[in-house]
Amino acid sequence: RAVLGRYYAKIKDNDLAMLHYSGALEILSEQADPHSAVEVEMLLGQVLSDAGRKEEASEHYLEGLALAEANDFRHLKGELLARLGEVEKDRSQRMEYLQKALSVFRELGANDRMREVQNSVHRVVMGH
């Protein structure tokens, strides 16, 4: 189901992508596979964000973040924090998410991703 969700996201059919990602989440919750569940929460959040449904995207990112933190999936935690920094409306909260993402990526030595997040921080500072 996650593969179908990814396919529909690529062809910009957000409704079908959301349907398949949601189905994949249901299956994964029964199988106790937290890593895949975090990834699907992130993918579902991205589809919702692409569809302009930022608040719903944020909810899925927060669900994924809770799972990532509980299982010490640090790279996924950084990704989710960065994505929360992209969809959050409140400027100070956006900065907080992005700063936390920067810290995680710095600890992991993920320099390319760190630069991307620094660009996001710059956009927030400049008011974009």
PLM region spans:
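Residue-level recognition of tetratricopeptide repeat
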Residues: R6, Q46, E79, R83-E86, ...
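Structural motif corresponding to the intra-repeat A-B loop/turn of tetratricopeptide repeats
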Residues: I11, Q31, A51, N71, ...
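Amphipathic alpha-helical segments of tetratricopeptide repeats
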Residues: G23-D33, L62-F73, L102-A110
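Terminal, low-structured helical/coil segments at or just beyond the last alpha-helical repeat
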Residues: F105-H128
